[in-house]
A protein has these predicted regions:
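Extended Gly/Ser/Thr-rich low-complexity repeat segments
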Residues: 129-137
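N-terminal helix-cap/turn-to-beta initiation motif at the start of protein domains
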Residues: 21-35
Length: 162
């Protein structure tokens, strides 16, 4: 019985520390910096990432189809409790927000390797992966569970704008 209790405590403590074990700085995400472009079925996309400045990074994004904006995004990554946390908002034309004003979408950094960062929503329904493939290419992979709980994947193959 003592062994079972000890093992249970060990697994609970290990699982809790694993979830909080990633330590990273916003500076570790500097590989994302640049102006990235892509022609996609949704439209022409442009995603700008400013380099880290202090404890944060910022991004703006636009998708334009047939000369008309489809939607915008504004993103910040801020150092929060030792880990970069992404906050995202979407906007229709006219700067009409999708999310409530006090509730941006939030994604915690869950994995970081050289030139690759994975962010995940608190409800674990969305993962965003940023991977710098080479000096001119970066993939952004959106993995999202649909209403049936099945993962859907969109890959955005960006090229660095000269």
């Amino acid at each position: 019985m003592k062994t079972i209790v000890s093992l249970t405590l060990f697994f609970l403590l290990t699982a809790g520390s694993y979830a909080q074990s990633i330590k990273a700085s916003v500076k570790d995400l500097s590989f994302m910096a640049g102006t990235w472009t892509l022609k996609h079925k949704w439209g022409d996309m442009e995603e700008f990432w400013g380099p880290p400045m202090g404890d944060n990074m910022v991004s703006s994004y636009r998708c334009v189809k047939d000369g008309k904006v489809v939607f915008y995004e504004f993103v910040v990554i801020e150092q929060t409790n030792g880990v970069p946390v992404m906050k995202m908002r979407h906007f229709n034309p006219g700067s009409i927000g999708w999310e409530d004003k006090d509730k941006p979408l939030s994604y915690n950094l869950i994995a970081l390797t050289k030139n690759k960062a994975i962010f995940e929503s608190a409800d674990k329904q969305v993962k965003l992966t940023y991977q710098r493939l080479n000096p001119q290419k970066m993939n952004v992979v959106l993995n999202e569970k649909d209403k049936k709980g099945v993962w859907q994947t969109d890959v955005f193959n960006y090229t660095l704008k000269p």
